UniProtKB/Swiss-Prot annotation:
Record's catalysed reaction(s): (S)-2-amino-6-oxohexanoate + NADP(+) + H2O = L-2-aminoadipate + NADPH + 2 H(+); (S)-2-amino-6-oxohexanoate + NAD(+) + H2O = L-2-aminoadipate + NADH + 2 H(+); (S)-2-amino-6-oxohexanoate + AMP + diphosphate + NADP(+) = L-2-aminoadipate + ATP + NADPH + H(+)
Pfam families for the chain: AMP-binding, Condensation, NAD_binding_4, PP-binding
Cofactor(s) the record lists: pantetheine 4'-phosphate
Domain Carrier per the UniProt entry, residue ranges: 858-937
Source domain of life: Eukaryota
Record-level GO BP terms: lysine biosynthetic process via aminoadipic acid; secondary metabolite biosynthetic process
Signal sequence bounds: none
Protein known as: L-2-aminoadipate reductase large subunit
Role according to the record: Catalyzes the activation of alpha-aminoadipate by ATP-dependent adenylation and the reduction of activated alpha-aminoadipate by NADPH. The activated alpha-aminoadipate is bound to the phosphopantheinyl group of the enzyme itself before it is reduced to (S)-2-amino-6-oxohexanoate.
Family: Belongs to the ATP-dependent AMP-binding enzyme family.
Disulfide-bond pairs as recorded: none
Amino acid sequence: MAVGTASLQDRLETWAQRLKNLTVSPLTRDYPDTQKTDSKRVIEAFESLQLPKAKLTGSSSSFIAFLTAFIILVARLTGDEDIAVGTNSNEDGRAFVIRVPIDTSESFAQLYAKVDKAYKEGSSQIVPLGSLRSYIQEKSKSERTPVLFRFAAYDAPASSQDYPANTFDTTDLVVNVAPGSAEVELGAYYNQRLFSSARIAFILKQLASIASNAAANPDEAIGRIDLMTEDQRALLPDPTCNLNWSNFRGAIHDIFTANAERHPEKLCVVETQSSSSPHREFTYRQINEASNILGHHLVRSGIQRGEVVMVYAYRGVDLVVAVMGILKAGATFSVIDPAYPPERQNIYLDVARPRALVNIAKATKDAGELSDIVRTFIDENLELRTEIPALALLDDGTLAGGSINGQDVFANDVALKSKPTGVVVGPDSIPTLSFTSGSEGRPKGVRGRHFSLAYYFPWMSETFKLTPDEKFTMLSGIAHDPIQRDIFTPLFLGAQLLVPAREDIQNEKLAEWIEKYGATITHLTPAMGQILVGGASAQFPALHHAFFVGDILIKRDCRSLQGLAPNVSIVNMYGTTETQRAVSYYEIPSYASNEGYLNNMKDVIMAGRGMLDVQMLVVNRYDPTRLCAIGEVGEIYVRAGGLAEGYLGSPELSAKKFLNNWFVNPEIWAEKDQAESRNEPWRQFYVGPRDRLYRSGDLGRYTPSGDVECSGRADDQVKIRGFRIELGEIDTHLSQHPLVRENVTLVRRDKDEEPTLVSYFVPDMNKWASWLESKGLKDDDSDSEGMVGLLRRFRPLRDDAREHLRTKLPTYAVPTVIIPLKRMPLNPNGKIDKPALPFPDTAELSAAAPRRASSALQALSETEQTLAQVWAKLIPNVTSRMIGPDDSFFDLGGHSILAQQMFFELRRKWRVIDISMNAIFRSPTLKGFASEIDRLLAMESFATSDDKTLAVQAANEPDDEYSKDAVQLVNELPKTFPQRTEAMLTSEPTVFLTGATGFLGAHILRDLLTRKSPSTKVVALVRAKTEELALERLRSTCRAYGFWDEAWTAKLQAVCGDLGKPQFGLSQSVWDDLTNRVDAVIHNGALVHWVYPYATLRPANVMGTIDALKLCASGKAKQFAFVSSTSALDKDRYVQESERIIAAGGNGISEDDDMEGSRVGLGTGYGQSKWAGEYLVKEAGRRGLRGTIVRSGYVLGDSVTGTTNTDDFLIRMLKGCIQIGLRPNIFNTVNMVPVDHVARIVIATAFHPPATGVNVAHVTGHPRLRFNQFLGALELYGYNVPQVDYVPWSTSLEQYVNDGEHNDKESQHALMPLYHFVTSDLPSNTKAPELDDVNAATALRADATWSGVDASAGAGVTEELVGLYASYLVQTGFLPAPTVAGARPLPAAQISEEQKKTLLSVGGRGGTS
């Protein structure tokens, strides 16, 4: 379609209006985004699917139909109703945005018409997307580049594997639609550092499912179109299966009684010492007898089954006695927390309508008697059968109830202490009444059932290895239903319950308490977990399981807990008061067993999957008869036999929330139950099997593993100024700020009654001082008690948090007010008490206005001390006391290998710290390097997310030192270079060669000396003490690589020198001789090191290049070949430019590129040194030099013999994959070329340079394998290395390194020297541009008349060559032999014993000789 005639400015304005207030939600991730910011994605992995056209009819096979299906899929996966995706013109392939509002009730055909119209309008007004972004950004005066779309679907008529030209940085997923004659191929490009291949494969199948289902029924509502496929269904719960509704395990109090009879003198409850009470211990017999007494009293008082008994409670053994006694009477226990205001206590009493009241003596002593308001309510509104005035279990185990009329209320019941009450209950009897929030502030009373209290404990015991020897904690809020877990779990197991004093439940002390008493199991809310770890330093290694319930659990808190309890496995349990014990679970293994597990988890821990006979059903919101497909947003329903009965006194609400299962006919369960009945006594209190679902109101998704992750509340979305805002999303991002320990966001009304976003946070004071120091600020703690003082003191942190949120959220979602608190107010249930959160008035905000900041305190940091300990551990003969702030890592004895090990240790110390290897060379002193770490810790200590990327970027500002240096070094070059018009090379040219003892250099030497026409003499620069030793080094190197002919010595001269010294360290006489004798210079030598900084490599790689050029400028005219590297182009800009060129039909980055794209910000010192070298050589070309710069990629083994350099990264990758038994899924192409072909190119360009000046010759592989193909060749030849996603592969590598069994030289992982590189983000790190190689081909064609071989078609590493290399490496002992018979046998590679011996003294890609 032709672009309209409107001006570009008019079209930009049209598009800006069209895309106003755009909703652009990302695809939910499988892994944390540790490397890229939210505004940047790298597309580097590929999946494909073929859909037979037979499943499509008519227009349903058109691109517009697939685009419509794609938009439906995006809507279903994100939950959005305003969809913007990228697409392209079917005429010229140019990209544009299509925006379509959707209604889930409209049909596919209706949406198709809307999409078709929007497509035609958009394709007729195309503007460059870069220009559109800039226009919108400038118009909105925003600091952030706008994101126009996260998803794109492109018309790719040639092939779905055509790399999409429009894979912009902000794209999560690109789908290419390539129609064929018999099938439509769908190809997906994605970033596997964020998304698993399993998720993408499911997405393609879902897209195909939408397309085929819509073809069959185009009038079906788009919200009802089925995304499910059989392979998804196999992973998800079956809502029609039997969940064993009738498998009642017995009443929890009867199980407790049986345990008491089996081991009566075993410790049951321990009340630990406090400042006001002694340490007290009670046995199972004492608790059993005491609860029997209470039970008999209640029965004698007329309490009937299911009647409520309210407990005015206190945390302690008395509460355990009260609960068990009430249950033994067949009654329902409920709890009032004395901390509640009297008015709220009355609400609970009004809802519960109890028939008995148990006052725990310690509660009345601590909080006072029931208030007059409560007492009046009881007298006027309740009909109590009995009241226990002061229940107390005395130190000797005697139970007291308090005196009435001069006699203890239990006086007539004590004689029955050894006898059970005999009250029978069943699975549908009501043992508990718990409260949860309700509308208009009135709580709902949830009636729990006996079925749930004991049903899941055997499964938990087996799954989590819980034994009778455990020590449980009693930390939950006493009126919060998780207290039931605290009490019932140990009593079921016959274990011990530890009760802390109130003073122990606070920061620092709680950790000390757990350590002191050796707790092994704890149940926590996330808020209580934050109290446990906040400010704590005590380690508690005995704790092996922590079960979290009640709120969202985030990775930061898990990491903090495992930092104190390395043996604790953390179990996140999703459930509600209404589901009772029927919950889902997701287990995080202990740090001791799997150090890196949390690294690859997202910030919010998923809900997981249902425990025994519990199902998490994510139901389609538009068609409840269907489960959601993987990744689709739906509402979470819990299906289980252990659900609560319902809400007390609210049958209508119960009917809305507790629903009969519509997926199955319930009659089948009744028939099964009747067949299994044995007329057990409890069946009289069982209404029969009820297949019910609890509607949670939470939104969620299935993950590719079949687990469930929560994605917010169906009702937790607020609108402010017309924008939809998810409060949970704000909280998630704010929690990732390193100094935020706790946080919560609310909507409050300001003075004008306008809704205002307010975030509250508790600063992490352990990091406050170092953070201020890193900012150059001083702590203003002169008045930090009141609101004004807190606002003023933490203003820098508030501002920083706001800036942090601006990088994560749209502007409208950034809270207007951010308030620091010393601690979060908690309600008695251990949750944040939101109504108690303060809101500052205008005067307070004004008084807290900023004051002048002062300089930061100068003090030795904790980071420096820790770092010194790490250095002392690694560097021989050094102790931490010997290391001062100005001591250098290298001066102390450190080197690059120890630096790699240091980074490994740092990751263990600080979990996932990710700092560039360059940092240690840039800042080698203790103080300097600690500062580098602090920059990252300021963004990393709680999260491995986008925040860390910002810190990495701040610590590694774009570096242009190398390019500025190159510009200055131009002054060192000769002004002119000699020229002549006759043939430059005679019949017997002399070539000066550097780097001849390296892998490539030796092969260049072989090629030169074996040429017949012309016969060539070689002068090789070798680092040695004498020319005899220099020649011997050349001889040994060649023998090691399988070639040497003693006859070569007649044409070979070795001269002693050093690249890093002026004039290569040659004497003036030798230098003068060379200037007059040499016809061509091949400058191949360099110091190759991937972590050394530019300054270290400069003498050999840059100044050495200047000396090579000076050699060319003196004496007779010479031709020049400079061996460079594609690392000089290692910038994202070149990858993007390459994609554009390929899409336009080109071959890749031109050899004529001016390198301006990498003038700033090259990441390695080696690449920087090669950039500077190239800059100087090109300038020499402008001054008269004739020559070529040869840019090579990976130089692999000889294509004939298989001789291979074992120090090469790719060869190390082969061995590393074999060592861990896995290979990563990396779709990038790899520019690999056999060494003999690279050598031929170098010589061809040296002998056949351009007529004038200097050009570039790219060394490009033909064919160019992908990483998957290269590593997959191992399986072809019998190595058992299945392919997995990169993140699991990286985790396996970390585990291999961490397990401590591979520290010796033989078993140390092959990738250890490159550990940081391969575990940071290998898919992105290995993404490289495609390269045009016209000049290389031209030189090879010209050389054919000399060499007799036309190699201009190029060469590359094939799967067959990988087999040859593997055979060679097996012969040398570098690789083990294949373990099974592969599809192909290893080719034969012959290697002599002499070669094996000489190989021990040779290595490296290129020497410094």
